[in-house]
Regions:
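Acidic/histidine-rich catalytic neighborhood
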Residues: 147-191
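Aromatic-lined, polymer-binding surfaces characteristic
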Residues: 1-161
Length: 191
């Protein structure tokens, strides 16, 4: 549909379909399951086909990491064994994560700005938490995460304005709930 143009809209549809399929699995009729699986397959294939041999060759493709990659990862693992391509997506997402993220450095900073850091915080917690859980390896042991706690504090200390690095971030007068929640989640993962 022309009304669902754009990757953020498609990723929202993929997320909703995956959440409904996974969360209501025992309540869905076979036709409802198939409808959701068809939607997951169509959007998942679209993302995968655009990422493979592209994403791994680009040093910065910021919109992918904000949400579409995370959502494809969750869709892949939720449908392994249900959609033939899902195991390929899962393998790709896992290997892409371990080869590229969380950062392209060890200092813990998000060099393209704090606003962009903020739109990535769900991915930066949810994907490594998921991979840590299924693999038994602590993905938060990466040097980037160890130093990221300092970045979160130094970029915007408690009760202060933001350092202003990033689109519109100079207007952040106090750390918002997302930043505080991220810091809390990071602290619990780094224990």
């Amino acid at each position: 549909s022309k009304y669902f143009a754009g990757y953020f809209n498609l990723s929202t549809l993929l997320s909703m379909s995956t959440s409904a399929y996974d969360g209501f699995y025992n309540l869905l009729s076979p036709s409802e399951k198939q409808l959701l699986l068809d939607n997951i397959r169509n959007i998942g294939n679209k993302f995968y086909n655009e990422y493979v041999n592209h994403l791994e060759n680009r040093i910065a493709d910021n919109h992918v990491w904000q949400m579409t990659f995370r959502i494809l990862t969750m869709a892949a693992f939720a449908t392994v064994g249900e959609i033939p391509e899902a195991s390929v997506w899962a393998d790709y997402c896992y290997n892409e994560w371990i080869s590229r993220l969380p950062g392209l450095n060890k200092d813990g900073a998000w060099h393209n700005g704090d606003s962009y850091f903020h739109v990535n915080i769900r991915t930066l917690i949810e994907v490594p938490a998921f991979f840590s859980r299924i693999s038994g390896f602590n993905f938060f042991a990466d040097p980037w995460y160890n130093n990221n706690a300092l970045y979160v504090i130094y970029q915007q200390p408690p009760f202060s304005k933001s350092g202003g690095h990033g689109n519109s971030h100079e207007g952040q007068r106090t750390p918002n709930g997302g930043r505080v929640g991220y810091a809390d989640a990071l602290a619990h993962r780094s224990e």
